[in-house]
Amino acid sequence: MVPGLALVLFGCIALLWIPVPSHTILLKAFNDFCHFPLFGGVAIILLYLARQLGEPRGWSVGSQYGMAFVGAVVLGAVSEGLQSLSSSRFAEWSDLLLDVVGAVCVLGLYATYDRNITGRLAVWRQAPWKHLVHAGVVLLTLTALSTVLIWTYAYWDRAARFPSLCQFSSSWEMLFVQGKESELQIVPPPLGWGNPRIDTVGQVVFYPKRYPGIRIEEPYADWRGFSRFRVDVYSELPTVRSLVIRIDDAHHNNEYEDRFNQAITILPGLNHIVMPLDDIRQAPVGRELDLSAIRTVMFFAASPPEEFSLYVDNIRLE
């Protein structure tokens, strides 16, 4: 029995090395959460092994639980350390934390039903201490699952706002927006914007770096059925500025010719930028951009000589 369980244990650890697709932020969050139940199972297997090896040697029940917990933590740390040596996997402290919390929760829950726990420790199998442990396990489980729940709602909110891609009006939509070599803030529109229905816009400060700008990661992916992409950009600068709009699909090979790239001129004042989706679809060389699988939208400046600021809003399809 013990050799068989040891084999199962190493099989559980080996699951961490199986390539799992993480093509979306939500799927990556779920894959990360899976460390929680996986190492809960590892801890239970280690507890059983400690019991089989320890009872004949007089190990206390507390020692058995302690060895199971320490063993799970060590295995989690070793697996993360080995992943740091791999070019295809990345070690993350958050994964190790989920390993630890998973082991704590499953061992704690099991202890409230474990008849081997006797004496003073037996109070943990009785009310109210048993219920207190159960409440703690539920709280820790929900905490571990919180990232998945947050991204699940963010995806629902993204779908509800479509065909708007970004209005800079919600903390949920801003989860998908990242600044690179720039600073992004949600601010009231400048006085010259001239649309009283707009409460907030995005202010982007472009630093004098190589490609400062903003990136919308995973906008609503299916753009079929629409004809135009638009964005409003307001400039308080006295001179014109140049930006580049870049759009990738899920099949992008990271080559310049395999995506949509369009330089646009930003004049002083309000600029309504409108682009036909047919132009976007036909942009890659040798293939068509997949309008059912849009992956990224970017706005950036190419090596600006100095810092400057623009206001962006109303990124949408029509």
PLM region descriptions:
Residues M1-T200:
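Intrinsically disordered, low-complexity, mixed-charge
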Residues V138-E318:
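Beta-rich carbohydrate-recognition modules and glycan-binding surfaces
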